[in-house]
């Protein structure tokens, strides 16, 4: 049955993303400027750091999704991982903003180790957290409502870290920025642990996979054709399946390496390498998907199921583009107000304004989706936010009020995007189960988390690469004036391009609200007739 969630459970779930965003938005907004202006790493080196660390995410997100899907405890599949990873997430949050007295090479090594540690802990925590939404209820409207609470919590956490961090650094550091960052992060790490515990102990996992016959006709318009027998790969140990997954990882890592190299170097050689890799990867994927199901292991079949899931593939592209859109803006704000506007304290006030508006945008998403439909709302929100963001380019340099008005207006619509994205990921998991009789909720959400983090990493790297191309050096004030045009572009039309691209892509999304209801009803019918099995 479709379980209606209580307000307590929705708020409790939202507290988890408030905690996660103390890390996520703190790193997104301030880690780049911390590396370049406090720790003394060059913009180009920091850009490469952000890109390389995202390659490790390509492995850990997918592996974590598979591990979570195969976890069976009294607490469920996902909540034990959230609870166990929380202390490590808080610790690495502090370490990333700590400045040990090292040589330049030592600083780079330290930055790589601590940032990789942070992203690994975030993966182990946030992949299960994201997937938890998919098993708390099977009602798509309840998921949209829950997603609204999630991102209201996210923006509340972001409000704390992004709005208060500059003031806390100044207050606790007493003129020593490095000390101020470290003490501030200890405060946020403590709060993170408390909020994550609230989430774990106020939520419950309810949705389980059912043993069903695989439909012969998997077209969306034929949901009731359920004859035929599902081919279920023989159970194997998690270790065996992870080893098997390792054999499939080149399909992820090699294309990621190619696009990372091309993104950073932007020359003919890396461009040719990227095109070649994509062509070979496409051939390899086609060969894999044509194999008979009986020859596939479970991990292979999970990957095949998702690669044939058009809604999921489109959502992955949307996740990347929307994160580039939001990530570029958030990544340059600290630089923009410190140097372009000439008032660093405005950074915190601007973030507070954005995040207050974001909370209203996230909470309004459920009602707006009911009015327009989620697909149409996604398009409207992207176009409106992109147009308003691009308008910042034409605002005079000292027009603070105009910047705040345009920025907040754009942020209201931008806040709708992640709320819809994670709600619709649950729909794509339903669609996969509908077509194949198999469900891999953790893998679906881990991939969603991966593209979001990849988009954030590429967005941060793009900010640093653009600033570096203008000759920016955070320790040399003489380089600032020449980088102001780059800051202006990064705050306006550059992110808007990714928003317009996202609006075009979502037009291809095949699941409107009516079709999603068909899928939901078909699955509810199956679940009422069949006993549950482990997913």
Region annotations inferred by a language model:
Residues 1-535:
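Membrane-embedded alpha-helical bundles of multi-pass transporters/translocases
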